[in-house]
Every structure is written in structure tokens, then in C-alpha cells.
């Protein structure tokens, strides 16, 4: 005998069981309007809805409100340890407001616009982007589409979109100041790709910090990506470039620093006895490599949270308190840096 499906629980059923009006239940279960409901009534309605197994009709809600309570997130490389905590922050902020997060990993920048067009077709309410290059046409594409959007971890240098970022220049100043305090004078930089704002900002931070200390301009090798392999290649180029070997190397991120470790070990050079190394990001496990990496710690989860909160403010028609939110980095000193050996 075929089992009969139980009748679908409606918003009217929740209202009757809660002893409140249907409109009260509607507001209580709408993330955009629930702030108008008292805490006691909100808890009562939510508990009743859970007990009865009520599932809101998202399609009907979207038709009524013009919102799907879904946001999109574009990431360049989900395997990069920087991005999972950023995504966690975005998801936490979204969950607190009853939003669903639609994530796309965009490994190839050429795919960004087609993916974004697909998200727009799904009627997302807004977008958090961590993928934009410098002078990226994607930013104009987003703006022309009329979509609410916020950048995270990378800022648009022209200010076309709001952003939540860390202070890349300050981060590099902290690393350089630490090395100079140890006695280093010949400091090199394995720079991030100059096609992305973070690569440019960190390079400028190193250059300015050395000028502030009245030290020679750094020897710079640009990495073609933020990867361990790129760090290996850049470190080889630096060692083969001739002249006096640098006493210390400021790396644009931790993966690049680990690539530098590989090449220095293969060359028979010791860290930090022969050369000091600093990273950037404080990704998981860099405190367990040999030697543990001195690096810059960033509030990645908070970056994600802030970006999402800025997006929700825009979606709800609120004025942003700032077009760019800048969070402060922190130096974490470990065993990969020490005073230089006597010349």
C-alpha cells in the first residue's frame, strides 16, 4: 500500500500553534524583518516552526520580497589556506541573517564572468569577491550588472567597490622592522604577482620600510603566483643573481616562504643561521615546520565576516560606514629569524 505524504505545514499552522497572527510569523521568519519582533515571540515562533517541521517556500518568498536570501562568493583558489577561514567568516555572518552562501572556486580568471552571469541568473542578492586583479574588467562587469558586491582580501585601487582588507603595507613594515632590529641590512623580497593588489601593496610596504630605515632598496624577485612552487623558482633566481647574498628574505606569503625553505636546504644554507626568512598569513602548521616560520598573522575570519556585513548593509539599503575596512596585521616571531652571522 502506498504511503500517504503528511500534509505540508503552512505558515498559518505555525501561527495557530504559536498563538500569534500569521503576519507576526511571517516577519519572525524573514531575516530582513525579524528585528521588529520581540525576542520572546521570535523564540516562540522559531521553536514552533522547528517542532512542526515547517519549511519556508523560498520561491514564494523571493517573489514577494524580491530577495532570495542567497549571496555568492568568488574565490581564486580554495586550496590556498588563506581562503577557508575567510569563507568561514562569510558563512557565519550569512547564517546569522538566514542567508545561504553559493561558493564558486574560480581557478581561471577567464571563467569569472561566465560564473558570475550564472550566479546572477540564480538571482543572488549580492556578491563577495576575492578574485579581482588590478584594473580588472570584472569590477565594471559587476557594477554594470547593478549587483551589490564587496571585495575581500583585495581592494579595488580605484575605489569602485567597497572592500574588507588587511593592511599589506603595515604587514611588510612589521617584518622589515623586526629584521632590522635583529641587525639585518641586506634584505630581499620575494614579491607576490604584480597583477594583484596584494602583491603590489606588500612590495611597496617592503620598499617604504627600507627607505624609512635608510637602507638600500631591496633585491626583488616577483613570483608568478602565491604558491610553494613559485617560491622555489623565485628563491633560485635570487641565489643565482650574483652579488652578496641577502642576509634576510621577506616573502609575500607563507607558501612562497616554504618554497624558499626548499631551495635553501638544497643549497646547503641554514635557516636562520645563514639567512633569515619571514612569511605572511600565519597559515596552519607553519609553526611546526623546521624551523618554525616567523610570519604575519592576519584576521582572515574577521575579514570574511566584515565583508559579508558590508554586503548585507548594502542589500538592506543602509549607508556603509566606510568604503574600505582595513584590519591590522600582527607579527608572530618564531625561529626562522635571528641576528645575521658576522660578516
What residues fall within each predicted segment?
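Bacterial carbohydrate/catabolite-sensing allosteric modules
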Residues: 1-6, 51, 92-97, 143-151, ...
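Short beta-strand segments enriched in small/hydrophobic residues
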Residues: 17, 22-27, 64-77, 178, ...
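Amphipathic helical "hinge" segments at domain boundaries
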Residues: 39-43, 51-126, 204-207, 223
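Active-site-adjacent beta->alpha loops and helix N-cap segments on the catalytic face
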Residues: 134-143
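Short beta->alpha connector loops
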Residues: 107-110, 130-135, 255
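N-terminal helix-turn-helix DNA-binding module of bacterial transcription factors
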Residues: 1-67, 343
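Short hydrophobic/charged patches on amphipathic alpha-helices used for structural packing
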Residues: 60, 113-116, 139, 176, ...
Amino acid at each position: 500500500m502506498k504511503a500517504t505524504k503528511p500534509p505540508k505545514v503552512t505558515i498559518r499552522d505555525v501561527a495557530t500553534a504559536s498563538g500569534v497572527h500569521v503576519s507576526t510569523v511571517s516577519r519572525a521568519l524573514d531575516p530582513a524583518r525579524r528585528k521588529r519582533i520581540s525576542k520572546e515571540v521570535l523564540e516562540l515562533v522559531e521553536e514552533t516552526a522547528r517542532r512542526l517541521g515547517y519549511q519556508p517556500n523560498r520561491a514564494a518568498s523571493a517573489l514577494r520580497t524580491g530577495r532570495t536570501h542567497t549571496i555568492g562568493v568568488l574565490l581564486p583558489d580554495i586550496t590556498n589556506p588563506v581562503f577557508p577561514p575567510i569563507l568561514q567568516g562569510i558563512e557565519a555572518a550569512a547564517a546569522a541573517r538566514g542567508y545561504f552562501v553559493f561558493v564558486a572556486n574560480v581557478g581561471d580568471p577567464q571563467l569569472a564572468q561566465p560564473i558570475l552571469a550564472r550566479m546572477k541568473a540564480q538571482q543572488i542578492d549580492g556578491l563577495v569577491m576575492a578574485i579581482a586583479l588590478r584594473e580588472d574588467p570584472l569590477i565594471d562587469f559587476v557594477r554594470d550588472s547593478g549587483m551589490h558586491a564587496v571585495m575581500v582580501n583585495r581592494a579595488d585601487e580605484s575605489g569602485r567597490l567597497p572592500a574588507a582588507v588587511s593592511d599589506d603595507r603595515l604587514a611588510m613594515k612589521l617584518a622589515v622592522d623586526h629584521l632590522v632590529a635583529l641587525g639585518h641590512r641586506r634584505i630581499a623580497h620575494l614579491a607576490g604577482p604584480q597583477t594583484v593588489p596584494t602583491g603590489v601593496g606588500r612590495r611597496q610596504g617592503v620598499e617604504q620600510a627600507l627607505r624609512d630605515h635608510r637602507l638600500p632598496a631591496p633585491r626583488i624577485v616577483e613570483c608568478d603566483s602565491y604558491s610553494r612552487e613559485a617560491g622555489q623558482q623565485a628563491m633560485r633566481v635570487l641565489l643565482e643573481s650574483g652579488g652578496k647574498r641577502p642576509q634576510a628574505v621577506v616573502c609575500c606569503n607563507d607558501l612562497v616562504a616554504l618554497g624558499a625553505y626548499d631551495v635553501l636546504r638544497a643549497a646547503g644554507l641554514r635557516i636562520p643561521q645563514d639567512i633569515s626568512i619571514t612569511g605572511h598569513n600565519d597559515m596552519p602548521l607553519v609553526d611546526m615546520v623546521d624551523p618554525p616560520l616567523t610570519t604575519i598573522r592576519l584576521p582572515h575570519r574577521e575579514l570574511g565576516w566584515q565583508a559579508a556585513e558590508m554586503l548585507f548593509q548594502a542589500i538592506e539599503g543602509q549607508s556603509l560606514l566606510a568604503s574600505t575596512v582595513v584590519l591590522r596585521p600582527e607579527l608572530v616571531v618564531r625561529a626562522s629569524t635571528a641576528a645575521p652571522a658576522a660578516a
